[in-house]
Amino acid sequence: MKITVLTLFENTIWPYLNSSIMLQAQKANLVQFEVVNWRNFCNDKHKTVDDMAYGGGSGMVLKAEPIINCLNFYKAPNSHVVLLSPEGEQFSQNCAKKLTKYEHLILLSGHYEGFDQRIYKYIDQIVSLGDFVLSGGELVALSVIDATVRLIKGVINDQSLICESFNDNLLDFPVYTRPYDLKGDKVPEVLLSGDHQKIESFRKEQQILKTAKYRPDLYKKYLENKNEKNK
């Protein structure tokens, strides 16, 4: 997979991509990253990326021309262009899985008041992290990249993916490490039993309880899917 990030702040992106799992994925040739500053595609000598909004209003609007020029240069027939904006669908684990199917992702990261509306005809999908506003789209881009890349086969252990949160709409089970007794708060005995069937059953039960307590929205989806399977 190739991922191209279009941004005005490329120095924000590279440190994360060149560390930890993202770096390992690059070294294993499982993903290729490209970070592009679309300011370089401005036609004027001042490299102007924003301007005042027609009709008035606060904030500056990102100009369409440099972004369109940049997209036309980097977009290929196999590209999928994702705009990172709070007006998009909320990003999820399922969304990340779908993104792994594309050979080339182009992530467009914004700033300021927003984009000139005329760029939207060049966009395939709009993604948001949630109903809140960030100063820019770089954090969103990195979140989308991390969640997507780690799902690419070979990046991390397959078993780790199966056990992670949001698999089957359940949060991950509680985990423990040494010491066994922390001021009277002890590790559940079943985890020390060596009985893998009992441990698996205990963990599944804890997943359900944890999801019901902390994410009732996910728990509702879990029950709906369970009932659907039992029909």
UniProtKB/Swiss-Prot annotation:
Transmembrane segments: none annotated. The keyword S-adenosyl-L-methionine applies. The keyword tRNA processing applies. Keywords: Cytoplasm, Methyltransferase, S-adenosyl-L-methionine, Transferase, tRNA processing. Its main location: cytoplasm. Its EC number is 2.1.1.228. It comes from the Bacteria. Pfam families: tRNA_m1G_MT. It is an enzyme of class 2 (transferase). It is found in: Cytoplasm. Disulfide bonds: none annotated. One of its GO terms (molecular function) is tRNA (guanine(37)-N1)-methyltransferase activity. GO terms for cellular component: cytosol. One of its GO terms (biological process) is tRNA N1-guanine methylation. It catalyses: guanosine(37) in tRNA + S-adenosyl-L-methionine = N(1)-methylguanosine(37) in tRNA + S-adenosyl-L-homocysteine + H(+). S-adenosyl-L-methionine binds at G110, L129, G130, D131, F132, V133, L134. Homodimer. Specifically methylates guanosine-37 in various tRNAs. Belongs to the RNA methyltransferase TrmD family. PANTHER family: TRNA (GUANINE-N(1)-)-METHYLTRANSFERASE (PTHR46417:SF1). This is tRNA (guanine-N(1)-)-methyltransferase. The gene is trmD.
